[in-house]
């Protein structure tokens, strides 16, 4: 009986530590995303044009380094995040090398592989979120999977649809075709904005979910998480 009690106490302690790690780093990642959105917004309003270009580059790489660290910390608990960390690190190192060499040729050659690597890293992150939530919040887990499907469909739609539209518009030179293409692009842009908002909402909810689980397990009788 004592052995059984000790086993469940140890299991709860492990689950509490795991939840605490997820709660902490998902919340850090959420606020990191908010910071980058604010920076991008200010940049679009030309409010940061007075800042040195090198500082903006440094902030961008600082974000990338932070992202690698976050993925690594999450990866210590779940392998999919470890994969995301490795891919993000590859993208970061490649970006630094290209920046140091000031090579437009390398930048052009890296553009497509870089996007593919980022897409795969994002896949492992989002599916990783779905998997770790499967036994704690099934609805949120399903939402992460749906969000990935929406995102990849929209990205493929943008990559394939826009070139096809340009070719068709060039062939037929029709105002109707042009208008339909513009509507298509606006629709995709709006949908991607919605996906980005949902990404932030799900990220915050995931962080809060694990923070609550960690607190519950730490305060439960027999837990030695503290």
Residue ranges and their predicted role:
Residues 40-59, 100-119, 169-188:
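Membrane-helix interface and helix-disruption motif detector
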Residues 183-199:
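Small-residue-rich transmembrane alpha-helices that serve as helix-helix interface/gating elements
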Residues 1-43, 60-101, 113-164, 195-226:
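Membrane-interface extramembranous regions at the lipid-water interface
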């Amino acid at each position: 009986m004592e052995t059984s009690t000790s086993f469940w106490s140890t299991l709860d302690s492990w689950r509490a530590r795991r939840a605490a790690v997820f709660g902490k780093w998902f919340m850090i990642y959420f606020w990191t995303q908010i910071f980058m959105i604010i920076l991008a917004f200010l940049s679009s309003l030309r409010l940061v044009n007075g800042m040195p270009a090198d500082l903006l580059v440094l902030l961008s790489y600082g974000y990338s380094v932070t992202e690698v660290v976050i993925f690594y910390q999450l990866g210590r608990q779940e392998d999919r995040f470890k994969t995301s960390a490795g891919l993000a690190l590859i993208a970061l190192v490649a970006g630094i090398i290209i920046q140091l060499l000031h090579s437009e040729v390398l930048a052009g050659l890296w553009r497509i592989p870089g996007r593919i690597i980022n897409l795969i890293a994002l896949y492992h992150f989002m599916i990783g979120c779905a998997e770790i939530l499967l036994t704690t919040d099934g609805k949120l887990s399903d939402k992460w999977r749906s969000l990935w499907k929406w995102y990849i469909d929209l990205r493929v739609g943008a990559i394939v649809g826009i070139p096809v539209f340009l070719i068709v518009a060039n062939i037929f030179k029709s105002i109707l075709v042009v208008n339909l293409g513009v509507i298509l692009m606006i629709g995709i842009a709006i949908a991607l904005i919605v996906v980005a908002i949902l990404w932030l909402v799900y990220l915050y909810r995931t962080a809060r979910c694990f923070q609550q689980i960690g607190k519950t397990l730490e305060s439960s009788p027999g837990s030695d998480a503290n």
